[in-house]
């Protein structure tokens, strides 16, 4: 059972709970730590493991570490990436992509209390942690062990590819990220070996499998099967299974320690991260294909049955993502609105087709 973020968060701006104010405490609006402990106990009796998100990349700007940093404490200022002028931030901006170019442009936020620039990859109220400071890893590990002691058995480690920063790079998928995940895995294997790490790695297919580590040096126990999810939706819209087949062939060639979570939709958007090298080999223009897919699934293409929403469109790059439930993207919503029973039958068949494909992978 994977519950959405429930740790203490600021209100109202909290990115759906992914801006964490206290990693050790359940948000008072949702309950108490005792409630969480009671829940995990009852779930375990029923043979159910509880999964919670553990946000590794950042804290809320109202976290006690951030508040101490704002108050001038140098110890906690070292927990974040802080700069007195734009010299280094401007160097980062030359190579680091923006996650939310429309709603949260740039990768840095000015903090008036400190008179410093803060690295904020996601939103201005989410301060990126500095894992080059060993104290950050130690304290974050203490928090994940605390939650394990409350009975949480699976941790979805959020935004893990972003956690290491280095000038002159994209600050994505750097080698140090794998070292940190490996260290966390080693701690868990020593202290609570039944606990599982589920990596949220929404990256290009070639980057994905590396987060399993190797049989000798394992990292995540399991990963979301992002590539198959994206390729299934792509095949449905394009009526072309070649990309899907190539991706499945690559998947089956991975070592036995690779354990994927197959899924069609989740709370996140669909990022159209297809394998561009394979697309080009098949004579498919990667950019035009991506544009076709996100326009198709927003319903803005002749013959589209979908009624999703375009998300995070960046006119500079032509990049965008898609939002919508499985039913809406398969055509159920549009068919019901038009009272079209034939279209509804096709929509349900699409839904069943995708679930059948995912179930037997």
Describe every region a protein language model picked out.
Residues 1-361:
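Active-site and adjacent substrate-binding regions of carbohydrate-active enzymes
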């Amino acid at each position: 059972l994977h519950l959405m973020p429930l740790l203490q968060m600021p209100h109202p701006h909290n990115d759906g709970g992914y801006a964490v104010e206290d990693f050790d405490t359940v948000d008072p609006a949702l309950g108490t730590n005792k409630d969480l402990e009671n829940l995990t106990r009852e779930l375990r009796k029923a043979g159910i493991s509880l999964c919670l998100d553990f946000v590794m990349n950042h804290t809320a700007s109202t976290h006690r570490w951030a508040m101490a940093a704002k108050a001038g404490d140098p110890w906690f200022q070292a927990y974040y990436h802080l700069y007195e002028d734009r010299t280094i931030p401007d160097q980062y901006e030359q190579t680091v992509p923006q996650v939310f170019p429309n709603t949260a442009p740039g990768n840095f936020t000015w903090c008036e209390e400190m008179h410093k620039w803060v690295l904020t990859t996601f939103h201005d109220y989410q301060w990126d942690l500095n894992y080059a400071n060993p104290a950050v890893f130690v304290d974050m590990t203490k928090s994940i062990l605390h939650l394990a002691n409350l009975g949480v058995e699976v941790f979805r480690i959020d935004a893990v590819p972003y956690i290491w920063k280095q000038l002159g790079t994209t600050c994505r998928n750097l080698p140090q990220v794998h070292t940190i995940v490996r260290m966390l895995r080693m701690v868990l294997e020593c202290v609570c070996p039944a606990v599982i790490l589920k990596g949220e790695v929404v990256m290009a297919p070639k980057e994905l499998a590396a987060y399993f580590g190797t049989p000798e040096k394992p990292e995540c126990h399991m990963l979301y099967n992002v590539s198959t999810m994206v390729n299934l939706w792509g095949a449905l819209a394009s009526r072309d299974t070649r990309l899907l087949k190539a991706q499945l062939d690559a998947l089956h060639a991975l070592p036995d320690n690779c354990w994927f979570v197959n899924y069609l939709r989740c709370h996140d958007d669909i990022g159209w991260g297809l394998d561009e090298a394979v697309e080009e080999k098949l004579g498919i223009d990667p950019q035009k294909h991506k544009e076709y897919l996100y326009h198709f699934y927003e319903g803005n293409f002749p013959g589209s049955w979908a009624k999703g929403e375009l998300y995070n469109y960046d006119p500079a790059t032509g990049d965008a993502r898609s939002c919508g439930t499985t039913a809406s993207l398969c055509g159920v919503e549009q068919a019901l609105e038009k009272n079209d029973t034939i279209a509804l039958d096709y929509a349900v068949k699409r839904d069943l087709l995708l679930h059948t494909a995912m179930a037997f992978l």
